[in-house]
Regions:
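Conserved beta-strand segments of alpha/beta enzyme cores
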Residues: 48, 95-97, 149
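Active-site phosphate-binding strand-loop segment of PLP-dependent enzymes
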Residues: 104-179
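Conserved PLP-anchoring active-site segment centered on the Schiff-base-forming lysine
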Residues: 62-116
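Conserved donor sugar-nucleotide recognition element shared by glycan-biosynthetic enzymes
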Residues: 33, 55-59, 81-82, 106, ...
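Conserved PLP-binding active-site segment in aminotransferase class I/II-type PLP enzymes
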Residues: 1-70, 92
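A short beta-strand submotif of the Rossmann-like class I SAM-dependent methyltransferase core
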Residues: 51-54, 77, 126
Length: 179
C-alpha cells in the first residue's frame, strides 16, 4: 500500500445554488426533516436515524445510552483522531483508552487493540479518518469475544466505501457529521 502524504481538504467551495438549497431545507420544516431521515435510512439500510447538532453530540448520546445500566466504563479509540472524540467520551463520564495506529493506514494497531480488550471495555470506536475506511470487520471480530459494542465513527467519511459497503454500515451503531 502506498503511504498517502497529503491531507484531505477541510472545506469545499459552496455555490449560490448550494446555499439556496440549504435554505429550502431549513424552511421545509418537518417534511424536509422526515424526507432526509427517510433518504438516510434507505442509503445506509439503517433501522433508525436521529438528527442531532454535531458528530460530537451524536457520540455523547450514543455513549450515554450504552453506559446506562452497564458497569463497563472504558472506550477504546485510535490514538490519532479528531479532538471531539475523546472530548465526547469525557463528557459522557467515561474513560478514554488510546490505541496506537498503523502509520500506513491510520487504522488501529490490531495486535495492540487485541491486548487492550477486556470485560471493562464498553465500546471500541473505529474511525474512518480523512475518509479512509477502517477495518470495522476486524474490529467486530476482536470485540465479539468480549461482547464489546462497536461504535463506527464515520464523521469524516459519509459516502466513502470499502469492499462494496458504505462506511457507517458495519458497526453496531454509527454516526456521521455534515460539518
Amino acid at each position: 500500500m502506498k503511504l498517502q502524504r497529503t491531507l484531505a481538504p477541510t472545506s469545499a467551495p459552496l455555490s449560490l445554488s448550494n446555499l439556496l438549497s440549504s435554505l429550502v431545507g431549513l424552511l421545509g420544516g418537518r417534511k424536509g426533516r422526515e424526507r432526509l431521515i427517510g433518504e438516510l435510512q434507505a442509503k445506509f439500510q439503517a433501522r433508525g436515524v436521529f438528527l442531532v447538532s454535531s458528530g460530537k453530540a451524536a457520540l455523547v448520546l450514543i455513549l450515554k445510552a450504552l453506559a446506562a445500566g452497564s458497569e463497563r466504563r472504558r472506550v477504546i479509540i485510535p490514538a490519532y483522531t479528531c479532538y471531539s472524540v475523546p472530548s465526547a467520551i469525557v463528557k459522557a463520564g467515561l474513560e478514554v483508552v488510546l490505541c496506537d495506529v498503523n502509520p500506513r493506514t491510520l487504522d488501529f494497531d490490531f495486535p495492540e487493540l487485541e491486548r487492550l480488550l477486556d470485560e471493562k471495555v464498553l465500546c471500541v470506536v473505529p474511525t474512518h479518518l480523512f475518509g479512509l475506511p477502517a477495518d470495522v470487520r476486524r474490529v467486530r471480530q476482536l470485540c465479539g469475544v468480549f461482547g464489546i459494542t462497536v461504535v463506527e465513527d464515520a464523521a469524516q467519511a459519509m459516502g466513502a466505501g470499502s469492499e462494496n459497503r458504505l462506511v457507517g454500515t458495519e458497526g453496531d451503531v454509527s454516526f456521521f457529521s455534515l460539518g
